[in-house]
């Protein structure tokens, strides 16, 4: 699936991962290794094949970035999604 076919939520999640990887100089491979998740799992998220990644997987990604779930999701983009739901 390409980015044009992703839901807004998926696109924001992928963008957040991409920004953090770039800031930290991580590749997808190193992120998967640090998060102790299969590389294919991460790539399914990045490509949008996984529509709803599990909380445990997202927590492991946050751990790899050495941040809490709150820090990971504390962005203007995620906040706007939450506000749309309310």
Question: Model segments located where?
Answer:
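The alpha-helix within a helix-turn-helix
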Residues: 21, 32, 62
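Short, basic-rich loop-to-helix N-cap that marks the start of a DNA-contacting helix
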Residues: 49-60
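DNA major-groove recognition helix of helix-turn-helix
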Residues: 21, 46, 57, 76
């Amino acid at each position: 699936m390409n980015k044009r076919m992703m839901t807004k939520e998926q696109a924001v999640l992928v963008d957040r991962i991409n920004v953090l990887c770039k800031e930290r100089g991580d590749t997808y491979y190193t992120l998967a290794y640090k998060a102790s998740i299969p590389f294919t799992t991460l790539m399914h998220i990045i490509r949008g094949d996984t529509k709803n990644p599990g909380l445990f997987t997202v927590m492991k990604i946050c751990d790899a970035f050495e941040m809490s779930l709150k820090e990971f999701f504390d962005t203007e983009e995620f906040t706007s999604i939450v506000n749309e739901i309310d």
